[in-house]
Amino acid sequence: MNYLETQLNKKQKQIQEYESMNGNLIKMFEQLSKEKKNDETPKKISSTYIKELKEYNELRDAGLRLAQIIADEKQCKIKDVFEEIGYSMKD
């Protein structure tokens, strides 16, 4: 066997290993989905997560705008408004 054939055989074995690993991961995903009674695909789960994250960010931004309005009215920092209502400035 020459060098190219040896390399080709190695690559073919790697491809077979990767295909086997992919099959095992798919089986594991299906098993875990059954255990969790979750029929959603990974794509649907991530799109739901992104949608909820966007909604969270919009609500957080609205809250920050309200806190800024209150701070402007009181002529103080937003930090002072948060401390007054018992929230920390951490996100």
Swiss-Prot record:
Involved in meiotic DNA-break repair. Required for the recruitment of DCM1 to meiosis recombination hot spots. It comes from the Eukaryota. Induction: During meiosis. Forms a ternary complex with DMC1 and MEI5. This is Pachytene arrest protein SAE3. Keywords: DNA damage, DNA repair, Meiosis, Nucleus. The keyword DNA damage applies. InterPro entries: DNA-repair_Swi5. The gene is SAE3. Pfam families: Swi5. Belongs to the SWI5/SAE3 family. One of its GO terms (cellular component) is condensed nuclear chromosome. It comes from Saccharomyces cerevisiae (strain ATCC 204508 / S288c) (Baker's yeast). It is found in: Nucleus. GO terms for biological process: meiotic DNA recombinase assembly; reciprocal meiotic recombination.
